[in-house]
Amino acid sequence: MDTKGTDKGTISIAFVHEALVCLRETGIDERQMLLRAGISPELLAAPQARVSSSHYGLLWHSIAQRLDDEFFGLDSHRMKAGSFTMLCHSLIHTDTLERALRRALRFFRLVLDDFHGELEIEDGVARIRLKDRSDPVSGEAVLPKRAFAYGTYLVVLHGLSCWLVGR
């Protein structure tokens, strides 16, 4: 993909690298997954490279199906394939974005264990605060394996919000 044009509709290769970590950890051939998604493996060596959002989406879907985890192994509890579809079905008829976000956050709290989000609204500004699970013995926060977990969570919520508002 041309890296000199506009960035609109593209994803940094850094996110591709992050998505591939779970494949490397499980010994799955990442090259085959990249090719299946229409992403040249050679782009991994180009730090400024970008891929189309549709190709990244194909990679995301392929990895989720292969691992049976739509959260890429980023939580101690996998988010089984089909969970996201069920989430969308549960949100499609909500009448406000606030209700949809609250329902989505409850859903994620059911399927993920390591952290959760809480919607806070103050002076017309909405914010999602992420809270890590605490260890039951020490009381200390149990942090996700990688910061990519937080980003993935927020990207999914943002994407859902855009989809719902666009309907």
Task: Spell out what each predicted region is.
Residues M1-R133:
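N-terminal low-complexity or simple alpha-helical regulatory segments
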Residues H116, E120-R167:
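DNA-contacting interfaces and partner/effector-binding or oligomerization modules
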